[in-house]
Design a protein with these regions (language model features):
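Bacterial N-terminal signal peptides
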Residues: 6-16
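Soluble non-cytosolic domains of exported or imported proteins
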Residues: 30, 76, 80, 147, ...
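Conserved polar/disulfide-associated segments of primarily extracytoplasmic proteins
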Residues: 45-139
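Positively charged n-region of N-terminal signal peptides that target proteins for export
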Residues: 1-4
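Surface-exposed amphipathic alpha-helical segments
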Residues: 38-40, 138-167
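Solvent-exposed, polar/charged alpha-helical surfaces in well-ordered, non-transmembrane soluble domains
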Residues: 33, 83-87, 155-162
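N-terminal "mature-domain start" segment
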Residues: 21-50
C-alpha cells in the first residue's frame, strides 16, 4: 500500500512538471514581454522600416498581436487615445461593433477596448490594451483573432499585457 501511495505521489509530481507553462521573454530593446507558450512566435521585429513588433499564436486567425508605441500630447489618458482610435480608425472596419472599455492594471496601467469586425468574410474580435508609460507615451497592444477563438485565450492576452515592462 505504501508503494502504491508513493508511486501515486511521484506520478502527480511528474505530471505537474509536464503541464508547467513554458514562458519565453521577448526583448524589443525598449521593452520586454512574456509570451505564455511556445505557440506564440515573433513574425516582425522593430527596425528602421517597421516601428512595431508583431506576433502570432500559431496562426493569425488564432491570435495576432501588434505592439505600437504612440507618442501623444502631454496629459493624454489611455482612455482618450482609445476613444480617438475608435472614432478615427476602428469604426471604419467592415461590420464594426463597439465593445466595452475596461480599466486594466499590470506593470503599466491603462484601459482595454474590445470590438468585433469582419475580415475576409470571417467574424473577428479585437482587443486593444492601452498602457501608459509616461505622460507622453502610451503603448498599444492590439490583439485580433477569430470571434470564437480570441476570447478563449483571454488569459494569455492579459498575461502578455501584464508582463509588458519598460527597460
Amino acid at each position: 500500500m505504501r508503494h502504491l501511495l508513493a508511486g501515486f505521489v511521484l506520478f502527480l509530481l511528474l505530471s505537474g512538471c509536464a503541464f508547467a507553462v513554458a514562458q519565453e521573454v521577448y526583448d524589443a530593446g525598449e521593452y520586454t514581454i512574456e509570451l505564455p507558450s511556445p505557440v506564440w512566435k515573433v513574425i516582425t521585429e522593430p527596425d528602421a522600416a517597421h516601428e512595431h513588433a508583431e506576433f502570432v499564436n500559431g496562426d493569425r486567425l488564432e491570435g495576432y498581436l501588434q505592439i505600437r508605441k504612440e507618442v501623444v500630447d502631454a496629459g493624454t489618458a489611455p482612455s482618450d487615445l482609445a476613444r480617438r482610435d475608435l472614432d478615427q480608425k476602428l469604426r471604419f472596419l467592415p461590420g464594426f461593433v463597439e465593445g466595452k472599455e475596461e480599466k486594466f492594471s499590470g506593470r503599466l496601467s491603462g484601459v482595454t477596448v474590445s470590438y468585433e469586425f469582419i475580415k475576409t468574410a470571417k467574424p473577428m474580435t479585437g482587443r486593444i490594451y492601452y498602457l501608459q508609460a509616461d505622460n507622453r507615451t502610451i503603448y498599444a497592444l492590439r490583439f485580433s483573432g477569430l470571434r470564437d477563438r480570441l476570447p478563449r485565450i483571454r488569459n494569455q492576452t492579459d498575461l502578455i499585457a501584464r508582463s509588458f515592462k519598460l527597460k
